[in-house]
């Protein structure tokens, strides 16, 4: 009987022109504090050439709140930095790094609340070595439930700030702050932005005129859901764009990038629409700032989560990571490989989460993108544990990608008519979950028998197998004939 080592991902769908594949493996050795209703971000805070980590949030009981900075040793190992002086009032808020004063280091803005609850917006200046000092002179609105976006809106060479959320008076707002070039901000009045909570926003050049326009999604003070687009005139003056195709959503996330490599920026949005349905939709830009919905995408439809564009397999196109709650019932964290021209396929399923936050970057300096995800997990005993996923991508000399698992997962026979044996290289799998290509869980079993043989009564097709052992979690493809 032939055994197929799926770290090579040899399936009937293999195509010669596709030289890469995607597999992210959880590093179970990390020791990061639990985070409930928190946020995470990565940046090189000490200018040593690697990405450090910050995580905010509360513990499982919502009694203690913590903001923790972790130093990276360059290999993806994170150690808590003691005595940072950062406020622990950070539940329900956001994090943003930016060099606001032009001194070549990353400053820090954190929003959130304490247990009272009082809302906060704390800004810190970095001395270049990762030591942060509070700057209490800034006018930023204390808030939760919104978003923070630093960008140069007026082409003057410094970073301005767009901020949304809910303030201490329980009112939803959208505010723009202009940087004077030294890191001092002032609020811009009379902007056209709709006030949005449960919101997401992103700056991008929608029409290739060399200034940053803005897309904004969320719910206003009248509980009306909106997704709006604003055109920048180049001087930081914005005008609402009418008749856009975007579906109105709240509890949203937005990702922007050139998904089809045609030289313009496309938009990916998830959230809850006016019919209280979850969505995840990709809108293609024609190059002039006019957008059209791409129908037939396979993305799982979520809200209260994240969407990210990222080239996980180093093939020069944008793959997609989607997390969040599916219709308020199940959770998800799915990766879709872009096989060119927006031909997406589900290739990896991570620990399912909602109320999630993601941070993507090369944490171990091996030239691929890793992921850190926090949120409320559905299928794990460690519900609020931050999870670090290492990208196992390596490339052979002939250009064939190999998914380098911590332990090889063996499925046989594969393809199968229904019965399949599943084991890891050194230990038997302790649990198996199998999903179809639209992300539905079709099989789950714990405490497998010594032979790890299972019987599947599923239609013919391709399935994703998530196998957990004592030492690792691995994802592989299975074909049912």
What do the PLM-derived regions correspond to, one by one?
Residues 38-47, 92-102, 145-155, 199-206, ...:
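Beta-propeller blade termini
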Residues 53-57, 108-112, 161-165, 214-218, ...:
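Hydrophobic beta-strand segments that make up the repeating blades of beta-propeller
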Residues 58-62, 113-117, 166-170, 219-223, ...:
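Short glycine/acidic-enriched loop and turn motifs that connect beta-strands
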